[in-house]
């Protein structure tokens, strides 16, 4: 069964020195800090041949492959792949010209087989007709189950075959397969090798395959043995065995390793057992196997690209962004429980804030010591007026009342003297009275001040009750009991609003921001851990395209969350909105996008879920406390207030309050400043995340 191979799409013909090889590595070094993974490595992959790359775990095979496909930069040396350096502007490596199958499979478990292949076909720009033809061929060739089968439900061998199918999908000119036949049925393994041999016969497809089945590598045209970041041997399998008088390839490689250890050679040994120079020149023996390319030193071709090509290479491709966007939305669709939870969580949170924050305390027990016994006394009239829904009066003796407060049973004590009524009348009528009369005509209050909100509420209720009591007793002369300070009607807002009115706008922004952080903080971490990011990089996806796709997909989620929150706070809890609803929505959406951007920074910078979660939670409380969401910024001491004003939500919270409660628009500085600060932080986080992601790839 055959499939047409994709034609090379190079902008210029291969240089003369490079036209006979697919990959040429010269003096390649790669280090991670002080650890040298690749040390002056030289490797040549002939055009149109299968190259078996063998070596123990940790010898540098995966690092070398990442350098070849352009997702990892080399510290020193030169690499050319299909005539040009990897990641060269206009060169589709990484991109459509390379098919990559990583060892860890790197598949989306929520996808079906068809979803997986369609996703990569969108990345590579295949037409729908081409995609269907290739999909049908690969499903039949790789003996895969029905294309609607979920990857999560497949066996390990079936998943490996799906991963191989994704690598073969676009008929690449270069195939890099990392352990493609592990866990695969022997019959199917033979069939896969037969297909690989068949597609290289045209001379247009070159294959690098790594395997720990050493004898299986005998089917390759050329084998190379890596150890400690060096290439010990590179020749046809039969040549290697003959030169070491071995009947098996495994035994020949064992001899090479022993020889390398004995000689202490760090740059490897040739198949003949001698030390290798940097050129690592080997003799080719056509009668012993397929010809090997000359390892004589060649001049590295200088590739140049004009500014138009570089600009085109840097600009994000809408096709790839759309593919990544559809991928993310499809994964969300396949997890309906998680999606519903994401939609309901902000509604639950804002409902709890509106219901539980800012209201008056209820059922506060207060001990009452009333030494007046007359039913018509002023003390009984005043106590009758006191708000009984908030304050529960418990009549007690003086000693019992204070004992109860000391035990924590009551929040305070109200005390009335036995002559409270007569002394209060004297205070109102007589011009001069003694201190004893003033004291006896006063309500004595002892409060537990450990809870400031309850203590302030008790004082407020007592003052309101006394004002009502005085008005009832003085009639038209009630103004005598008024304070000389008169609070007029508010310019903005109303006098009967509670603390929840202050908290709610900031809470909406905070919930939107941190739910967006939570949505994205683990996205790159999990995809990097599962190898999905690396596979996308090799397919030609850039960091900018990845960022934009995540941004757009998460924007859909937070848009639904914002709509549900606004419905609840405006229609259910009747929060006032005197300004433009579009400005309210715009500011909340911008805060959500800023949260997404910050989550992407965390996800790009962190390597594991625990670190990402700690980073997200670590900034939650400082930002909540310092941003003026639960307490005014004016209460923050000045050295710390400068930090508060620099945070993303401080000015934004103030701007949202101005829009909702004052009805202000963008002409007011307090409003447009909130938008400007939010936009600035959003741009900063996006650029930072893109830079971090690019540096880490």
Segments from the language model and where they lie:
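Conserved ABC ATPase "signature" region
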Residues: 118, 122, 130-146
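Helix-to-loop junction immediately C-terminal to a conserved catalytic motif
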Residues: 69
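Extracytoplasmic/periplasmic domains immediately adjacent to an N-terminal transmembrane anchor
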Residues: 187, 206, 278-501, 666, ...
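Membrane-spanning alpha-helical segments of multipass transporters and channels
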Residues: 243, 341, 348-359, 370-375, ...
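Catalytic Walker B motif of ABC-type/P-loop ATPase nucleotide-binding domains
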Residues: 175-178
